C-alpha cells in the first residue's frame, strides 16, 4: 500500500506543489528588512551605544572622579585625571578620555558609576574616516551627554526597576 501512495505522490508532484505554495506565501508576506538609512529601526532602551558624560540639571557635571569606571574597564579604554573642584575640597575630572577603538561596549563603566555620570547612549551612528576622531575627550563626552540627555534620562528611568 505504501508503494501505491508513494507513486501517487510522485505522479501528482505533491512536494513540488507544497514547496511552490510555501514560496508564494513568503513572497507576498511583509518584508522584515528596513531601508536603512532612510528608515530607522527601533532601538532597545538597554542599547549600549556611544558614550556620554551627563550633567546635573543645574549644569554641573556629574562625575566625581572616583575612577571606578577606569578601574573596572576590561579594555583599559578610559583615562581619568582628577583635580580639586573648588574650595570645598571635592574632586572633579580634569581629563576624561575614552579610546573608542579599544572599547568593547560592555557597559561595566555605566554599572560602576555611583552617580550615573558615564552612560552609553542610544547613538549608534558615529562612524568616521579618521581614527583620531574615535579618541573622545571630556568636551566631546559632555557634548554627547547634552545632545542625548532626554533619551538617556528616559532609558535610565525605564530600566531603573531592573537595576
From Swiss-Prot:
Ranges for domain 4Fe-4S ferredoxin-type: 53-83, 94-123
Gene3D superfamilies assigned to the protein according to its UniProt record, in alphabetical order: 3.30.70.3270
Family (UniProt): Belongs to the complex I 23 kDa subunit family.
Lipid bilayer topology: Peripheral membrane protein
HAMAP family: NDH1_NuoI
Catalytic activity of the protein: a quinone + NADH + 5 H(+)(in) = a quinol + NAD(+) + 4 H(+)(out)
This protein's name: NADH-quinone oxidoreductase subunit I
One Pfam family here: Fer4_7
Signal sequence segment: none
EC category name: translocase
Subcellular location: Cell inner membrane
PANTHER family from the UniProt entry: NADH DEHYDROGENASE [UBIQUINONE] IRON-SULFUR PROTEIN 8, MITOCHONDRIAL (PTHR10849:SF20), NADH DEHYDROGENASE UBIQUINONE IRON-SULFUR PROTEIN 8, MITOCHONDRIAL (PTHR10849)
Amino acid at each position: 500500500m505504501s508503494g501505491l501512495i508513494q507513486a501517487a505522490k510522485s505522479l501528482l508532484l505533491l512536494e513540488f506543489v507544497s514547496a511552490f505554495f510555501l514560496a508564494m506565501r513568503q513572497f507576498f508576506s511583509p518584508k522584515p528588512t528596513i531601508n536603512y538609512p532612510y528608515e530607522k529601526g527601533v532601538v532597545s532602551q538597554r542599547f549600549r551605544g556611544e558614550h556620554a558624560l551627563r550633567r546635573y540639571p543645574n549644569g554641573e557635571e556629574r562625575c566625581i572622579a572616583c575612577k571606578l569606571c577606569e578601574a573596572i574597564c576590561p579594555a583599559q579604554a578610559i583615562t581619568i585625571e582628577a583635580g580639586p573642584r573648588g574650595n570645598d575640597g571635592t574632586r572633579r575630572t580634569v581629563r576624561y578620555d575614552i579610546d573608542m577603538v579599544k572599547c568593547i561596549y560592555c557597559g561595566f563603566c555605566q554599572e560602576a558609576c555611583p552617580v550615573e555620570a558615564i552612560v552609553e547612549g542610544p547613538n549608534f551612528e558615529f562612524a568616521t574616516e579618521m581614527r583620531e576622531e574615535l579618541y573622545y575627550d571630556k568636551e566631546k563626552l559632555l557634548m554627547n551627554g547634552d545632545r542625548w540627555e532626554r533619551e538617556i534620562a528616559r532609558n535610565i528611568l525605564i530600566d531603573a526597576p531592573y537595576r
